Amino acid sequence: MAKKITFNEDARRGLERGLNTLADTVKVTLGPRGRNVVLEKKWGAPVITNDGVTIAKEIELDDPYEKIGAELVKEVAKKTDDVAGDGTTTSVVLAQAMVREGLKNVAAGADPISLRRGIEKSVAAVSKALLTSAKEVETEAEIAACASISAGDPQIGDIIAQALEKVGKEGVVTVEESNTFGTELEITEGMRFDKGYLSAYFVTDAERQETVFENPYILICDSKISSVKDLLPVVDKVIQSGKQLLIIAEDVDGEALATLVVNKIRGIFKSVAVKAPGFGDRRKMMLQDIAVLTGGQVISEEVGLKLENATLDLLGCARKVVVSKDETTIVDGAGSSDQIAGRVSQIRKELENSDSDYDREKLQERLAKLSGGVAVIRSGAATEVELKERKHRIEDAVRNAKAAVEEGIVAGGGAALLQSGTSALKDLQLTSEEAVGRNIVRSAIEAPLRQISLNAGLEPGVVVGKVSSLPQGHGLDASTGEYVDMLSRGISDPVKVTRSALENAASIAGLFLTTEAVVAEKPEPKPAPGPADPGAGMDF
């Protein structure tokens, strides 16, 4: 296919038009008085949202150069969302401001490479200043305040704070749709996986249709168990100990399963068999996690262990096990804390080195099951449109709160970026050409506050001047129009969110400014429709 090639100023301006179209759509959502954007869907109800990355993903432009410009900015929003879970609109506003100022300077003859270097050094200085001024998040109330701002709802903020208090920052907080109104929180203690009992005859609590064991042994095997003679030696040892047995294996069937069921029905020996969670290599990893958590070993021929030779010291233990039709929960495994910490550290390293979103999600789940726990927030609403919008807001707020716990918080509403940034840039030593890059960043760090003011119906220039003269940490509460101590009012942003937004915006601005040519697909003319059949639709 033929290509269109554009050079110099024309190329950069084409990209900028696409950036501006996307940024102007997204930035109306910024701040407590930001508006929503309605997104049409090919199927089903439209989506109403104020989430920057969701809006950005939906924007497709006709002009090939504008399309490329918009795609570059989408990448800023997506990267910020991936790293910090929020701040997507802020990152787009910052990118637009940097590109606009930068292109003016390039058009006036500034060296793009020096500009880029100046921008990078300035952003590094501002990021360092933000981290230095950060306040650690310690109390449940502080976490709730952070989550409330992201979700725009204090009740959601309180529920997220409770969830993180229970499961810790490594724990998993998932958001599910509910058939009822309101928002509920459910906490799962211990490790839970989505495999239930292999036979309903194992049930010990008929009312709840669950098998509940106190202090059972746990047999973990990575192969299929069909023969009763393989299972009998270890079962005999467990019977002599007077305890119950949970069997986790690739599968349990045939005479092995029948024998366990018969012994349970006759009241001779209580046990329950479940399939191992996951598939392939992930199954092996999860079995190893269960073994570490319960203080047992995976009985596998790969490590020279056979089921018929298994002894009680190879079995795991837990304070309580609950098995339902669909899932198994192991509470308070007897594994050593050192081994669990080592396993957690290993998974964390894998998480850092993983590029796949799917793998990262699964590793995060494993990490949570070992180190924290799982909290489920169930959200309901009157209509499907409201339900989807509410669920999305809660997911963003969860990630925002986790980011706050990780690196701390700074004053929100664009105040920290403006105040910390201005003082950091004042002391920065740069060459005369790089100093132009500093001026671009100095102008850009005002942009979020300007947009928040504009969306609140205030005069941006007046607000920026006022906030610049206020003490560190004071700023504009855009919901009331008052100038207040932001942190004491609960108006805060996680440092990770603000820092990621600034760094990602600077990265894309540098690419824009150093672009000298753009190669795009040349749209093919659509073939003219053929002549209509004169006899079509007539009966003969």
Swiss-Prot record:
NCBIfam families listed in its UniProt record: GroEL, PRK00013.1, PRK12849.1, PRK12850.1, PRK12851.1
Protein name, entry field: Chaperonin GroEL
Matches recorded under InterPro entries: Chaperonin_Cpn60_CS, Cpn60/GroEL, Cpn60/GroEL/TCP-1, GroEL-like_apical_dom_sf, GROEL-like_equatorial_sf, TCP-1-like_intermed_sf
Record flagged with keyword Isomerase: yes
Subunit structure as annotated in this protein's UniProt entry: Forms a cylinder of 14 subunits composed of two heptameric rings stacked back-to-back. Interacts with the co-chaperonin GroES.
Ribosomal protein in keyword set: no
Enzyme Commission (EC) number: 5.6.1.7
Enzyme class, UniProt record, top EC level: isomerase
Gene: groEL
Compartments where found: Cytoplasm
Positions of ATP binding: 29-32, 86-90, 413, 493
Reactions mediated catalytically: ATP + H2O + a folded polypeptide = ADP + phosphate + an unfolded polypeptide
Chief location bin: cytoplasm
Recorded family membership: Belongs to the chaperonin (HSP60) family.
GO MF term set: ATP binding; ATP-dependent protein folding chaperone; isomerase activity; unfolded protein binding
Gene Ontology CC annotations of this record: cytoplasm
One BP term from GO: protein refolding
Keywords in alphabetical order: ATP-binding, Chaperone, Cytoplasm, Isomerase, Nucleotide-binding
Region (Disordered): 520-540
PANTHER family, alphabetized: 60 KDA HEAT SHOCK PROTEIN, MITOCHONDRIAL (PTHR45633)
